[in-house]
From Swiss-Prot:
The keyword GTP-binding does not apply. This is Chaperone protein DnaK. Pfam families: HSP70. Induction: By stress conditions e.g. heat shock.
C-alpha cells in the first residue's frame, strides 16, 4: 500500500514527513536540507526553479522570483492586505479573471495555488526519492485561522501538484499531535505558532490518544515576513537619511535588503550584534560620473527588539481571546509548545513566558514539528497509527441572513468539526414562491456587517401564507473545514445547495476586522439586533391580528373592533418610526387587544353552544383552536 505523506506548506519554508516504523520521519530534500524554501523562480531561459536554487538567484532575478505566496492564497486582489503586499514585494501581483490575487512571472500569470503547487511537487518528489515509490496522497497543513477560501485554494494546490489531499489540518493541531503522541496523561496545552507569514494560537486537551481543540485564534497576516519588513524599512530609512536615496524604489536593492534583513534577524537570535554589509547597493550619478554607494550598518539585538515590539505584542490579543473562548486562564495551561521559526527569537520566548507564567516547551523542532504531525495524521487515515482521535474546530461562526437583516448563526466559532446542523425557516410574505439563502461568516449581530460567502435561490415553493412553508437549511462543515450549505423545501422535497468557492473567500483583514468590530461595536450590534427583532415581532403580530379580525370580525362588537384597528394603526406607526421602545410598547398593547378579541370570540362560541337546541359543530371548534394557536404563536 502506497504511503500517505504529511506536508507543512509554509509561507517561508516547507517540510515533508512520513511515518516510518511507527514514528514520523522528516525527509531531506535533494540538497540535503530538511526544509525547503517556499520560493519559485522562472529564469530567462524559461526554466522553473524551486526551493534553494530559486532562493540563490533571487537577488539577480527579483521580478520572476515568487516568495511568500501563501499570504495571497485564497485572497482577492482588492483586499487591503494584498494591496499592502504589492508595495513590499519585488514581483508583480495582478488581478485574476475571477478577481483573485495572482502573480506575474516569466511572462505569465499564475494563481497562488499554482505557485504553491510547484512547492508541493518538490515535496512530493522528495518523498518519492526517499520511499522509492510513487506518492499520490497527502495530508497538508494550513494555519488554524485560514478561512474557507484559503483552505479550498490549498486543496486545489495539492490537486494541481498531482496529490489527492486526504485531509487539510490546522498547523497548531498537527504540532500538538507530534508533541503529545507518546503522552498518555491528560494535559491542557497551548500551541503558540508564529511562522513566516501567519500566527495561530490553539488551546488543546490531550490524553489517552484524544487530541481535542478547545479554541483557536490568530492573525493570518502576521509572521516572520513582517519582522523582515521592519528591518528592511529601518535599513532603508537609515540609508536615505545618510545618502538621500530611497532603496525601496530599486527592486534589486530591495531584494538584497530583504536577504540581509532575514539573515540579520536569524543571527541576532544567538548573537547580541551583527553587521550588515552590502557593497554597491546602488550608485549616484554626479556630473556624468557614477559613484557607487555601499550600505554598512550594525544592528543590535536591542535594535531588532525595538523594531518588532509591536508585532510581538500583536500575538497576545489572540492568545487572550483563545483562552477566553476555552474558558480557562493562562495559569491552567500545563505546557506551551512553540512552533514556527520566529519562536527561536529570544524576545518572543520571553513574552510567551511572561504571558503564560511558565517556560515554554522547547523539546520539538519548530520548523519540523508541523510536518511530523501531518505525517501522524496521514498514518491515522492509512490505519498505521492506532488509538488516536483528533477533534478540531472551525475558527469563525457561520450563519444565514434572516428577516430584518439579522445574522442567524447556525454554527458557532470553535465548534468541533466535522459538524452538521439543520434549522427550519419559513417565508416572510404571503404566496412567496422563492427564497434567497445568503451565507455569512463572522461574529457580528447584523448580516451586513459580516462577510458574504455566497448565496443561492430555492425556487418552486407552492404559494401559501407566510410562515406556512417549511424550508430546512443545513450547514455541513467537513473535517477539512470546508463548508457546504443546502436548503430544502420539506413540502415539495426540492433542494438546492452551494459549496463556497475560493473566489468568494474571506480576506485576512476581513476576519480580523470582524472580530475587532464585534468587540468594539458590541453595544451597537445589540441595539440593531433588538430593533430588528422588535420590528419582526410587531409586524408578525400586526399580520396575525389583521387576519384574525378579517376572519372573525362578525363575532366582535363594534367598540372592540375599533380599539383593535386603532392598536394596529399605532403599531404600524411605531414600526415606521424604528423606535425600539415604541415598537415593543405598541406590540404589547396590540397583544392585549388581540387577547380580548380571542376571548370575545370564545365567549360568543360558548354562548351559541349553550343556547337551547343549538349544536356546536366540530368544525367550528377546530377553527377556534386554530385561532388560539395562531395568537399564541405570535406573542
Amino acid at each position: 500500500m502506497a504511503k500517505v505523506i504529511g506536508i507543512d506548506l509554509g509561507t517561508t519554508n516547507s517540510c515533508v514527513a512520513v511515518m516510518d516504523g511507527g514514528t514520523p520521519k522528516v525527509i531531506e530534500n535533494s540538497e540535503g536540507a530538511r526544509t525547503t524554501p517556499s520560493i519559485v523562480a522562472f529564469t530567462k531561459d524559461g526554466e522553473r526553479l524551486i526551493g534553494q536554487p530559486a532562493k540563490r538567484q533571487a537577488v539577480t532575478n527579483p521580478d520572476n522570483t515568487i516568495f511568500a505566496v501563501k499570504r495571497l492564497i485564497g485572497r482577492r486582489f482588492d483586499d487591503p492586505m494584498t494591496q499592502k503586499d504589492t508595495e513590499l514585494v519585488p514581483y508583480t501581483i495582478t488581478k485574476g479573471k475571477n478577481g483573485d490575487a495572482w502573480v506575474k512571472a516569466g511572462g505569465q500569470d499564475y494563481s497562488p495555488s499554482q505557485i504553491s503547487a510547484f512547492t508541493l511537487q518538490k515535496m512530493k518528489e522528495t518523498a518519492e526519492a526517499y520511499l522509492g515509490e510513487t506518492v499520490t496522497q497527502a495530508v497538508i497543513t494550513v494555519p488554524a485561522y485560514f478561512n474557507d477560501a484559503q483552505r479550498q485554494a490549498t486543496k486545489d494546490a495539492g490537486q494541481i501538484a498531482g496529490l489527492e489531499v486526504l485531509r487539510i489540518i490546522n498547523e497548531p493541531t498537527a504540532a500538538a499531535l507530534a508533541y503529545g503522541l507518546d503522552k498518555q496523561d491528560g494535559k491542557t496545552i497551548a500551541v503558540y505558532d508564529l511562522g513566516g507569514g501567519t500566527f495561530d494560537i490553539s488551546i488543546l486537551e490531550i490524553g489517552d490518544g484524544v487530541f481535542e481543540v478547545k479554541s483557536t485564534n490568530g492573525d493570518t497576516f502576521l509572521g516572520g515576513e513582517d519582522f523582515d519588513t521592519a528591518v528592511v524599512e529601518y535599513l532603508a530609512d537609515k540609508f536615505k537619511a545618510k545618502e538621500g536615496m530611497d532603496l525601496k524604489t530599486d527592486k534589486l536593492a530591495l531584494q538584497r535588503l530583504k536577504e540581509a534583513a532575514e539573515k540579520a534577524k536569524i543571527e541576532l537570535s544567538s548573537a547580541q550584534t551583527t553587521e550588515i554589509n552590502l557593497p554597491f547597493i546602488t550608485a549616484r550619478m554626479e556630473g556624468g560620473a557614477t559613484t557607487p554607494l555601499h550600505l554598512v550598518e550594525t544592528v543590535t539585538r536591542a535594535d531588532l527588539e525595538k523594531l518588532v515590539a509591536g508585532l510581538i505584542q500583536r500575538t497576545l490579543d489572540p492568545c487572550k481571546k483563545a483562552l477566553a473562548d476555552a474558558g480557562i486562564s493562562a495559569k491552567e495551561i500545563d505546557d506551551v509548545v512553540l512552533v514556527g521559526g520566529m519562536t527561536r527569537m529570544p524576545k518572543v520566548r520571553e513574552v510567551v513566558k511572561d504571558f503564560f507564567g511558565k517556560e515554554p516547551h522547547t523539546g520539538v523542532n519548530p520548523d519540523e514539528v508541523v510536518a511530523m504531525g501531518a505525517a501522524i495524521q496521514a498514518g491515522v487515515l492509512q490505519g498505521d497509527v492506532k488509538d488516536v482521535l483528533l477533534l478540531d474546530v472551525t475558527p469563525l461562526s457561520l450563519g444565514i441572513e434572516t428577516l430584518g437583516g439579522i445574522m442567524t448563526k447556525m454554527i458557532d466559532r470553535n465548534t468541533t468539526i466535522p459538524t452538521k446542523k439543520s434549522q427550519v425557516y419559513s417565508t416572510a410574505e404571503d404566496n412567496q414562491q422563492a427564497v434567497t439563502i445568503r451565507v455569512f461568516q463572522g461574529e457580528r449581530e447584523m448580516a451586513q456587517d459580516n462577510k458574504l460567502l455566497g448565496q443561492f435561490d430555492l425556487v418552486g415553493i407552492p404559494p401559501a401564507r407566510r410562515g406556512v412553508p417549511q424550508i430546512e437549511v443545513t450547514f455541513d462543515i467537513d473535517a477539512n473545514g470546508i463548508v457546504n450549505v443546502s436548503a430544502k423545501d420539506k413540502g415539495t422535497g426540492k433542494e438546492q445547495q452551494i459549496r463556497i468557492q475560493a473566489s468568494g473567500g474571506l480576506s485576512d483583514a476581513d476576519i480580523d476586522q470582524m472580530v475587532r468590530d464585534a468587540e468594539k461595536f458590541a453595544e451597537e450590534d445589540k441595539k440593531r439586533r433588538a430593533a430588528a427583532e422588535a420590528k419582526n415581532n410587531a409586524e408578525s403580530l400586526i399580520h396575525a391580528t389583521e387576519r384574525q379580525l378579517e376572519e372573525n370580525g362578525d363575532k366582535v362588537d363594534a367598540g372592540l373592533k375599533a380599539e383593535i384597528e386603532a392598536a394596529i394603526a399605532e403599531a404600524k406607526t411605531a414600526v415606521e418610526s424604528g423606535d425600539i421602545d415604541a415598537m415593543n410598547a405598541k406590540a404589547q398593547a396590540l397583544t392585549d387587544k388581540a387577547m380580548k378579541m380571542g376571548q370575545a370570540i370564545y365567549e360568543k362560541e360558548q354562548a351559541t353552544a349553550a343556547s337551547p337546541g343549538a349544536e356546536a359543530p366540530k368544525a367550528d371548534d377546530d377553527v377556534v383552536d386554530a385561532e388560539f394557536s395562531e395568537v399564541d404563536e405570535n406573542k
